Each structure stands twice: as structure tokens, then as C-alpha cells.
From Swiss-Prot:
This is DNA mismatch repair protein MutS. Coiled coil: none annotated. The keyword ATP-binding applies. Gene3D superfamilies: 1.10.1420.10, DNA repair protein MutS, domain I, MutS, connector domain, P-loop containing nucleotide triphosphate hydrolases. One of its GO terms (biological process) is mismatch repair.
Length: 860
């Protein structure tokens, strides 16, 4: 590095400590980037790439952004998953000889964003950490730095379990050790799309020991320690707003894996990846940002505690019964700002006067919200009201100190009210009187000189001045006016009196601003003492906001309060898919019943494509989720069990990850459900077996149904195109056939979307193809093939359209000529028997791959 200039050497020394981040290196009014950072940033940020002399023969690549507008560029990099290290000058260049000292003052990463512009109001921004204990369990901790939330748990050392937690939280960043990162599969890293940060230290920092409770396990403490150490090293400031770590058990909530949540579109649409068209979109009428975040948490983790579900239902009932009070509550909530993130910014030291005005205005609403809740004479709502802490002394202090019109800048005055501090009032009087004197001076000088256009002005460079147009300078008396600045068409002067008054005014203004900043920081420090109380208040307000949202949505959409069954039975009368109904309109939607109990555990659903089988299945699951988050449900009547888990395999929107086929994904998801489901679970399987050959698929579908019926006993909705499976109703006591009805009118199919008992009598597949506007000749050809295949129930392989060859044995249908059947060798017979004896449903994916390799070697 000897050939580089001192400044470039300094840059490289700092960059060496932050290899995985873009280093924003402060040079004057710019943040500069060099070398590879410059090459990459210029492309990502679409800024000009230049070069700088640095002691080498060739110029060093360089690009930069103005420091006053750097936030937007930082946000862009963070949104794309990068990290940014902010390197500032920590010495005054005017008083420093030689190289100015520079240090990284903060590392900003996807999981540590604090700037409002980089955060979504109704979404948490989670950073998580992992500690693997002897390969048996994961200590798992996560935090939202912007709100101070900190939680932890212990989960099974399984990638599936880890993925479920990370996706439930929409985690932006995961902290792991180098060894842990190596263990995690590339497939997982690619699938999650989050930022991985390597950090080894995992002991609890001494100043944060109070955040951890004694009963936590070693792996949990290590995960928390790793997270806290990483935040301490990267943020380099007080993190006093971090709350005490709350231990949670995943078993206390309904479990749904990533694919089930995606298939049901709980918080993210499959199509647009946004909220539009999701259950969260429908249920969200929260008035506060923090209420919106809590609502998403509720939907991501439905309750399984009967008492807590009923408590929420009671609150929603009371709010629905008090319409006018609820309207008043909504108006009050609209004026409550994001108390959680305000508290975070206070702790971070980057809160401004307008933030404190928002805090004060929010606190004004708390007594009103409390009074409204108490007026409803509800025991449950009274308990919520009594949790509201109005922080009266803080409200009074903010009212007394901060101006309503305070600017964003905290160093230019205009923040503190008159009368708050006597010394500040003295400085202000001096400044105001001086300005009054100057205004009077302008009038007097005009009279004295007769120059009507003369004016007294001020700028930061030259201070106060008297400006006279060049045409009138001869009217000025000699010896009294001292020239200060020459302009194109005017001259600027100063007089001895103005010079004296300028010093008094500017001294007063400077002292006034210094004192105002000091007083503001004192108020800010006082607010810090209230952080914990504000965080508790924010939680209570958020809960009230979520409950009023449920009440509002339930009323507007004609939802009813469900009953929770004791015997595991499910009875829904005229149930609706809440989101589809909202999109289509209530008049267009066809409601349906659903009944499941110990004698009717499996519903086998048949019917044509596009008839509504998948929608019906989803609506049952969404009804259960609505009930277990404490909301009312879209039905005329509903009795529902408390499901411990929901498993879904719905639709064809498969992620073909890691080169897996649709069928492999299908089987993996089926295995996940069958292995983990209990009698208290809900399983939704849509067209299982469609991804493989006809008879393979049918055989697997039947075996899966039988296995669930005999071993799992979960409530199951199973849709299929294999009409042969409807005969299972005769063999399996707990299986019932239902179908989605359709009729033909004038040769066209009409979907009625109505669920009826019994199997479908026809598939209408060709009619659906016709609706899709396939070529007419193709439709006609398909109709002829269908007619031939249905003839006498014989399976036919078409070798020539005019001379069909009848085949009476069961074979897979083909549209092409087939080779004559060859005699099976003894070696092949052994392989077939070995394959037939394999227990596929009990195999892990790795076992299956090893077995496949073994069989392949026997063939060769």
C-alpha cells in the first residue's frame, strides 16, 4: 500500500474492516466510494463513475453522492440487500494538522434500518440470529430495531422449521456464525432471499444482561447474545429502547408452513406479491401503523388458546354493539402516530422537534380513547382502557416547551416556546428589538437621503447592509457610509450604528440558537425516561386498533361470531370466501355449507375445473383462521374446532426450487402434512397425484386418503379428477363424496359453484377447454377421442383414427403408437417387487434419492 496517497491508505484500512459493505467515505460535502465499491455502486445507483489520483499510475475508480441527499441512495442499496458503512470525519478539518481522522459511525443493513423512508409503516423490519446447539436444536432470536421488540425461542434443528420462522417474520437479515452458514443449504439461502451476516461473538454484553431472564436455555441466550453483539458493533450508539427478551413457544399458535400461508394468501398475494387480495388486506382497517403491524402478527400466528380467542371475540362483540362510540374511537386513533418507532428514534438520538409534536398530539388522544372505552360498560374493554398510560407529566412538558410550528432542523432555532426559559426570552427580545430598530433605521435613512428605494437587508456571508442602486449613490452623505459589497447595479454599505447593532443582534441570535438546542436536548433526554412506558402504551393502543378493525370489517361484511366446538366438529352454514366475496361483490358470490365431524372426517371433492373446488377449500381454511385470530367469520352460522395446524397443497403455482419437479414438490408437501398432522389438524389437498402418470397418481391419491383415514384422522378436504376414487366412500366410513355442480345449457357448460352431496357425474373438461378458446378443430378431435374412450368403458389407445385398437387391460392412455409389450425379465421383476415394497411416505427426501441411486446402479 506504500504507493497510495495517505487518504487512500486511510480508506483501505477502514474498508478492510467492512469487506461486505459499501463504504461511504466522507470527503467534504460528499460520500465517496473507491475501487470495486465505486464500480458496483455506479451501476446499481446509476451515478457517474470517475477517477481520482491516488498515488498509482492509473486513476482509482471513484463515484460519490452528496451527503445531504445520501439517504435516498442508501435506501436503494439496502432495498437490494446490500449493507452500507457510514464513515464520517470525526475531527474538525479547520483545527487538524495533516490527515483528518475518520471512523465508521454506523453500519446500515437490511435488518438495521431506522430511517422512516426505508421502512414500511405497517410492516416490521426484523433481524434474526441463530445458534445451533450440538446439531439438535436452534436457539432463535429476532428483533425489530425500529420498535425495540426482542423475542426468542428454541426450535428443532431442521431447515423446514427454520424457514417457517424466518418466512413468518418476513426476516430481512439473519446473523449466523461461519460454521452455521456452511451447514445451511444453498437452496435455503436462495429461497429465502435474505441477507446473511456472519458474526461469531455470542455472549450477552454486560450492559444488556437485564434483557435476558434466567430460565432461558443456553442456546436461546447464545442466539440473543449474538444478536445484541452484532447490533452493538454495527450501530455504535445507545440501544436503550430494546425491550426485555420475551420467550415464545411456536406450539402456542396454529402452525402453518410457508407454502400453506402462500397458498392461502394470508399476507402476500401469489400473483402480485403485494397485500392486495389477501386476508390481511381484507381485515386491515387499522388506523395506526403500529396497529397494522400487530394485525399482521396476529394473522401470521393464529391462537390455539380457547380463553384468549373468546376474550378477543368478546371485545369485538362489544365494539360492534357500540357503533357511535366505535366511530369516536376511530377518529381518536387516526390522530395517534407511530409511538413504537417514535420511541426508537428517541433512543437513537435522531428524533426532531416535529417528532415530539407528534408524540404530544398522540398523548392528547389517550384520555379520550380511555373515556370512550369506559363508556361502553364492558368488562373486557374496561380492562384494556385501564392499561392506557396517558404519561401526563410528559404531555405537559411537551406542551410547555415545543412550538407547534417547530422546524425539522434542531440547530436553527424556532423550537422552544416563549416563556419556557427566561434567558432564552432575553436573547429573543434583544434580537427582536434589534430587528425593530433596523426596520426603523430603513425608514429614517430613506427620509435623510431622499432615496425611496433604499433598503436594509441581511445575508449569512456579509451580515446586515444598506443597499442603494448605483444611480442614487451620489445622494449619500460623505464620510458616513462604508462600502461593503459591489453588485452589478447596486452598492451595499454599512454605517457605524448598523455595525454596532448587527453585533448585538447576531450575538443574541447565536446564543439563542445554542440555548434552544441545549433546551431541546434536555426535553429529548426527559422523553428517554418514558421509553418503556411509551412502548407498553403502544402495545395497548395497537391491540385496541386491531379489535376495532375486526369489528368494523365484521359489520361491513356481515360476518358472524363463531362458536368453538368441544368435540372437534366443524359446521359452517352458507360460508363464503371472505376475499373473493369482497372482490366479486356479495351479490355475485355463491355461499356453501361445510360439515366435518368424527364420522365425516374426509370430504372427497369432485367437479370440473373452474367450478370453484379450490375456492371452497380455501374458504374453509380462511374461516378457521379468522375464528382463531379472534375475528368474526363469513357465514350465516359457524361452529368450528380449534385447529393446531393447517396444511395445504392447493393450485399449480409451484416454486420449482432446486430443480425439483412439480410432482416432487407435491410429494414433499404431502409427506409434511401426513407426518406432522394430528387429529386436530386441517388438511387441504388439491389434485394430489396430478404431476405423474395417470395410474401412479391415482394409486398415490388413494393411498394418501386411506392413510389419513386410518392413521391421522385429521379433518381433510381432498379434491380430485380421479372419479374412480369416489368409490372409496363405500369402503371408508369417515369419507364423504361431495361435488361442485355444473349443468349444460345449449351445449355450453354453466358452473353453479354450489356444493352438493355425492360425486360429480361429469368432468366437463372439454367444455373448459372450449371456454379457454382452444382451436375448434382441436376441441372436435378431443370430443371424438372422449366418445371412443367412454365406449363400453374400455381403455383405448388410438393407433389410427379409423381403426381403433381395443385394449382391455388397464394401461396409461397415450396419443401415440406404443411398442408391443415386452416380456419382463427376472431381474426386472425383482426390481419391480423391490420398488413396490418401498414405504415412500416414511422416507426423507435424502433417503429417497439414495434409494433411487441404488436402484439405478442395479439397472446398469
Amino acid at each position: 500500500m506504500t504507493e497510495y496517497t495517505p487518504m487512500i491508505k486511510q480508506y483501505l484500512e477502514i474498508k478492510d474492516k467492512y469487506q461486505d459493505a459499501f463504504l461511504f467515505f466522507r470527503l467534504g460535502d460528499f460520500y465517496e466510494m473507491f475501487f470495486e465499491d465505486a464500480l458496483n455502486a455506479s451501476q446499481i445507483l446509476e451515478i457517474t463513475l470517475t477517477g481520482r489520483e491516488g498515488g498509482t499510475k492509473e486513476k482509482i475508480p471513484m463515484c460519490g453522492v452528496p451527503y445531504h441527499s445520501a439517504s435516498g441512495y442508501i435506501d436503494t442499496l439496502i432495498e437490494k440487500g446490500y449493507k452500507v458503512a457510514i464513515c464520517e470525519q470525526v475531527e474538525d478539518p479547520k483545527t487538524t494538522k495533516g490527515m483528518v481522522k475518520r471512523e465508521v459511525v454506523q453500519l446500515i443493513s437490511p435488518g438495521t434500518v431506522m430511517d422512516e423512508r426505508g421502512l414500511k409503516a405497517k410492516e416490521n423490519n426484523y433481524i434474526a440470529s441463530l445458534y445451533c446447539y450440538e446439531g439438535k436444536e436452534y436457539g432463535f432470536a429476532y428483533s425489530d430495531l425500529s420498535t425495540g421488540e426482542l423475542k426468542s425461542t428454541v426450535i428443532e434443528a431442521s431447515e423446514d422449521r427454520l424457514i417457517n420462522e424466518l418466512t413468518t417474520l418476513s426476516t430481512r437479515e439473519l446473523i449466523v456464525s461461519e460454521s452455521e452458514k456452511t451447514v445451511l443449504s444453498d437452496v435455503m439461502k436462495e429461497q429465502l432471499g435474505l441477507t446473511f451476516s456472519v458474526h461469531e461473538e455470542d455472549t450477552i454484553p454486560s450492559e444488556n444482561e437485564k434483557l435476558v431472564t434466567r430460565h432461558m436455555s443456553l442456546s436461546e441466550k447464545r442466539a440473543i447474545g449474538k444478536l445484541l453483539h452484532y447490533l452493538k458493533e454495527t450501530q455504535k450508539r445507545d440501544l436503550g429502547h430494546l425491550q426485555q427478551a420475551v420467550h415464545y413457544e411456536t406450539s402456542n399458535y396454529m402452525k402453518m408452513d410457508y407454502y400453506s400461508k402462500r397458498n392461502l394468501e394470508l399476507a402476500e398475494s401469489i400473483r402480485g406479491k403485494g397485500r392486495q387480495g389477501t386476508l390481511l388486506w381484507l381485515l386491515d382497517n387499522t388506523q395506526t401503523a403500529m396497529g397494522g403491524r400487530m394485525l399482521k402478527q396476529w394473522i401470521d400466528r393464529p391462537l390455539i388458546d380457547r380463553k384468549k380467542i373468546i376474550e378477543r371475540q368478546n371485545d369485538v362483540s362489544e365494539l360492534m354493539a357500540n357503533f357511535f362510540e366505535r366511530l369516536e374511537l376511530v377518529e381518536n386513533l387516526k390522530n395517534v402516530y407511530d409511538l413504537e418507532r417514535l420511541a426508537g428514534r428517541v433512543a437513537y438520538g435522531n428524533v426532531n422537534a416535529r417528532d415530539l409534536i407528534q408524540l404530544r398530539n398522540s398523548l392528547y388522544q389517550i384520555p379520550r380513547i380511555r373515556a370512550t372505552l369506559l363508556s361502553m360498560n364492558s368488562k373486557s374493554l374496561t380492562e384494556l382502557a385501564n392499561q392506557l398510560d396517558p404519561c401526563e407529566q410528559l404531555t405537559e412538558k411537551l406542551e410547555e416547551a415545543i412550538m407547534d410550528s417547530a422546524p425539522i432542523s434542531i440547530r436553527e432555532g424556532g423550537i422552544i416556546k416563549d416563556g419556557y426559559n427566561s434567558q432564552l426570552d432575553t436573547y429573543r427580545d434583544a434580537s427582536r428589538n434589534g430587528k425593530t430598530w433596523i426596520a426603523e433605521l430603513e425608514r429614517k435613512e430613506r427620509e435623510l437621503t431622499g432615496i425611496k428605494t433604499m433598503k436594509v437587508g441581511f445575508n449569512r456571508v456579509f451580515g446586515y447592509y444598506i443597499e442603494v442602486t448605483r444611480a442614487n449613490t451620489h445622494l449619500l452623505p460623505e464620510g458616513r457610509y462604508e462600502r461593503k459589497q459591489t453588485l452589478t447595479n447596486a452598492e451595499r454599505y454599512i454605517t457605524p450604528e448598523l455595525k454596532e447593532k448587527e453585533k448585538l443582534i447576531l450575538d443574541a441570535e447565536e446564543k439563542s440558537m445554542e440555548l434552544e438546542y441545549l433546551l431541546f436536548t434536555e426535553v429529548r433526554e426527559m422523553v428517554k425516561d418514558y421509553i418503556e412506558r411509551l412502548q407498553k402504551l403502544a402495545k395497548s393502543v395497537s391491540e385496541i386498533d386491531c379489535l376495532q378493525s375486526f369489528a368494523d370489517i365484521s359489520e361491513k361484511n356481515h360476518f358472524i361470531r363463531p362458536t368453538l366446538s368441544e368435540d372437534g366438529s366443524l359446521h359452517v352454514k352458507q360460508g363464503r370466501h371472505p376475499v373473493v366475496e369482497k372482490v366479486m361483490g356479495a351479490q355475485s358470490y355463491v355461499a356453501n355449507d361445510c360439515d366435518l365431524d368424527e364420522n365425516r372426517e374426509i370430504l372427497l371433492i369432485t367437479g370440473p375445473n373452474m367450478s370453484g373446488k379450490s375456492t371452497y377449500m380455501r374458504q374453509v381454511a380462511l374461516t378457521a383462521i379468522c375464528a382463531q385470530v379472534g375475528c368474526f367469520v363469513p357465514a350465516e352460522e359457524a361452529t368450528l374446532p380449534i385447529f393446531d395446524q393447517i396444511f395445504t397443497r392447493i393450485g399449480a403455482a409451484d416454486d420449482l426450487i432446486a430443480g425439483q419437479s412439480t410432482f416432487m414438490v407435491e410429494m414433499l408437501e404431502a409427506r409434511n402434512a401426513i407426518v406432522h398432522a394430528t387429529k386436530d389438524s386441517l388438511i387441504l389437498f388439491d389434485e394430489i397425484g396430478r404431476g405423474t402418470a395417470t395410474y401412479d397418481g391415482m394409486a398415490l391419491a388413494q393411498a394418501i386418503i386411506e392413510y389419513i383415514h386410518e392413521n391421522v384422522h385429521a379433518k381433510t378436504l381432498f379434491s380430485t379428477h380421479y372419479h374412480e376414487l369416489t368409490d372409496l366412500e363405500k369402503e371408508l366410513r369417515g369419507l364423504q363424496n361431495i361435488h361442485v355442480s355444473a349443468v349444460e345449457e345449449n351445449g355450453k357448460v354453466v358452473f353453479l359453484h354450489k356444493i352438493k352431496e355425492g360425486p360429480a357425474d361429469k368432468s366437463y373438461g372439454i367444455h373448459v377447454a372450449e371456454l379457454a378458446e382452444l382451436p375448434k378443430s382441436l376441441i372436435e378431435r378431443a370430443s371424438r377421442i372422449l366418445e371412443q374412450l367412454e365406449n363400453e368403458n374400455k381403455k383405448i389407445i388410438i393407433t389410427n383414427e379409423k381403426q381403433p385398437e381395443e385394449i382391455h387391460e388397464e394401461v396409461q392412455l397415450s396419443m401415440f403408437p406404443v411398442e408391443p409389450e415386452k416380456k419382463t425379465s427376472s431381474k426386472e421383476t425383482k426390481l419391480i417387487k423391490e420398488i413396490a415394497s418401498m414405504n415412500i411416505m416414511q422416507m426423507t427426501p435424502m433417503d429417497a434419492m439414495n434409494k433411487l441411486y441404488e436402484l439405478q446402479s442395479k439397472i446398469h
